[in-house]
């Protein structure tokens, strides 16, 4: 392990999107707090939903559902809690419980898709243990694990 955190790269933002984030931070909330001149035309219509677009992650609350748009600030509440940027690939992966040693391949869109479409590894592991236990094979699993045949 070389100590380098892989895939810790966020998408570049336009000056307009940086201004939007600054206004949201100043006024709190989400895209509804953006001044009219910075709002997208589609957001100016009445009864428009998806108010989480351009939303800032609250570090004191559970993370939003991680989707394939997890690095795009206009796709949901995917703005970094303290910095004017979206989530990096690594931050999104951590929210999905991927170990930092796991390295994603491809461009930003492909890596975001891999993360957003994945079953979180810790959820998969916990589910697998429940299924194994349910099937009455838990003892065999533990024995195989101690022999190094299966890793946790």
Question: Would you name each region that the model predicts?
Answer:
Residues 1-152:
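C-terminal target-recognition/interaction regions appended to catalytic cores
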